[in-house]
């Protein structure tokens, strides 16, 4: 399946802006964006709409949806929103499955609870660098610096998946060995509404149907979450 993703160019698809509109209603500002995900050959795979609602208290609500355009995009590895912070945002607290990485078909070892860790320790250090460290069924997650300032991500209609690393997915893809993976001046956070199951790994069958991510022309993937600031604990 990974080879199939590469064949159709899903692993290197880029977001091409289609439209952007801004509205204001009393104390709430609304920004709506539409993107096409295209391959290097400008072949459109899917269309995404991401809406942002900002209130006067600094809280942002994000609503994202993805609709199929290409008939080949029957399965996805994940669908979510990423954000980069400075590397000083190292501390993590979350309410979800933990303390180890877990996925929809690989989670019984990780009971639901409130866990504290660091961005450095989120990912599992496999010899061959690969996507890892996902935390599933997350109700909320908080990323802060040493002073306690940062961001809190709250699930809304359904649970979210959360991950954070000091490297980007592009750097992960290029690294051949764990020692090739740079420790960058960034905290790369991932808020995913949908994450594919692991199946039996690279040498076994793909996940069963209930752990795959399927979507269609008239049945888009949809999820939403909130982002709110966490104030510096030393601030008077």
Regions found by a protein language model. Give the residues of each.
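Beta-strand/loop-rich accessory regions of lumenal/periplasmic or secreted enzymes
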Residues: 1-236
């Amino acid at each position: 399946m990974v080879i199939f993703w590469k064949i159709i160019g899903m692993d290197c698809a880029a977001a091409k802006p289609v439209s952007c509109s801004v509205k204001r209603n009393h104390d709430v500002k609304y920004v709506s964006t539409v993107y096409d995900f295209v391959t290097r050959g400008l072949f459109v795979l899917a269309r995404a709409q991401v809406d942002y609602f900002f209130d006067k208290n600094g809280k942002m609500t994000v609503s994202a949806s993805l609709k199929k355009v290409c008939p080949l995009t029957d399965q996805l590895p994940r669908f979510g929103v990423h954000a980069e912070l400075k590397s000083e945002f190292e501390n993590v607290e979350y309410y979800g499955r933990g303390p180890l990485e877990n996925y929809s078909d690989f989670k019984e070892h990780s009971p639901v609870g409130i866990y504290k860790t660091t961005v450095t320790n989120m990912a599992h250090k496999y010899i061959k660098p690969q996507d890892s460290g996902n935390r599933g069924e997350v109700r909320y997650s908080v990323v802060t610096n040493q002073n306690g300032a940062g961001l809190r991500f709250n699930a809304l209609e359904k649970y979210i998946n959360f991950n954070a690393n000091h490297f980007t997915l592009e750097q992960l893809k290029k690294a051949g060995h764990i020692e090739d993976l740079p420790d960058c001046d960034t905290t790369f956070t991932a808020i995913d509404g949908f994450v594919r199951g692991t199946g039996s790994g690279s040498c076994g069958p793909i996940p069963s149907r209930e752990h795959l991510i399927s979507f269609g022309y008239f049945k888009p993937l949809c999820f939403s979450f909130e982002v709110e600031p966490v104030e510096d604990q030393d601030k008077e």
